[in-house]
Amino acid sequence: MKNVKTLLILSLFAINGLFAQTVFEQDGYLSNLNSFQFFNKEIASFIQIPDQWNDQQFHLRWNTRLYHGEHWSAKMSLRNRIFTGYSWEENLFGFKDALEVDVLDLTAINEEKVGMQQQIDRLYVQWERGNWNVRLGRQRINWGIQNYWNSHDLFNQINFFDFDYLERPGSDALRIQYYGKGNTSTQFAVNENIQAGLYKFNAWDFDFQTLLAKYYNDYVLGLGWAGQIKEAGFKGEFAYFINSESQVKELVGSIGIDYSLQNGMYFSSGCLYRSQADDFNPFALINQDISAKNPMPFAYNFLHQINYPIHPLVLVGMSLIHNEELDIIFINPMLTYSISESIDLMISSQNMWMWSDDTYENLTQTVFTRLQWTF
């Protein structure tokens, strides 16, 4: 993949040098995310961490795009983050280790009290002509169809709890897409570890997609759909993984419904099933290894969400995740306020309880505030 990255970077310079009349666009944002953590005192004492701490993150994102003629374009996006607080200082729950490091990442500052990471999470060249689209480089390959948990998202799995990553991760890959007749399309995408094909078509007023892939050591077959049942949306996707070495088989699937009222209120509910979920670890939600086979650490997961614009500038909402195996509840209330056309304020919290000794015991609570300026 290093050769692919080298070729990509050289291609970017070639496009910029060979074509004098190139359209350049840019945008981005600057945000400050504060978090205040409150941990269960007994558990905190047992694992020898404080029961309260706070962290700060400053995030500058810069997106650039080049266009030449009708067929060629390129994109590069920089993600620059500064970290301070207890999680950075103590490398809490492997905080530093979780920061992705590769050829296009640079830890510019690694001091005891502060850290800075500069990451290129989009860097690709794209060619389009007629029904064809070819893209090479670090990109988002969004194959998920269900709202929350996506077993078809082989290249860029979403972490539901990482709400601050608005653009979501990218992957180094080559993707070829062809748009056929009658709302059909075919995609092929490959990188070092994944080779996959996706076919989309429409039938019975539903959009369907089929997936065939080699995903690390697994062969994958998948089916997904999206459509309407009366006025409610109905989506789902399932993937069947067969390990080429151990022959272990795993089914990962999710279904969901959503509904919007005329006053703007939005409801959504979904369920995720994993046939080979790992042994339960309540803190896997905090520090889990997200993948298409492991979008959540439990076998059965239920999510319910409601959003409502109480004012044209104010949106409130709440998400609830429930695991019935050990009766864990995760609640995530949220409020966003549009201060101006370019400045937004968000206040949110993530709270987790577990049923123990005939009562729900609080495990952890985190309060977030984020101020963001978009340019």
Language model segments and positions:
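Residue-level signature of outer-membrane beta-barrel architecture
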Residues: 22-24, 64-68, 126-129, 178-180, ...
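Transmembrane beta-strand segments of Gram-negative outer membrane beta-barrel proteins
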Residues: 21-45, 74-76, 182-186
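Repeated loop/turn-to-beta-strand initiation elements of outer-membrane beta-barrel proteins
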Residues: 70-74, 131-134, 182-186, 205-210, ...
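Detector for outer-membrane/organellar transmembrane beta-barrel domains
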Residues: 203, 228-321
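Transmembrane beta-barrel strands of outer-membrane/channel proteins
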Residues: 28-36, 76-80, 136-138, 188-190, ...
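Outer-membrane beta-barrel "beta-signal"
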Residues: 306-308, 335-337, 343-344, 348-349, ...
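Outer membrane beta-barrel
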Residues: 65-184, 354
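Hydrophobic, lipid-facing positions within transmembrane beta-strands of outer-membrane proteins
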Residues: 56-62, 118-123, 170-174, 195-197, ...
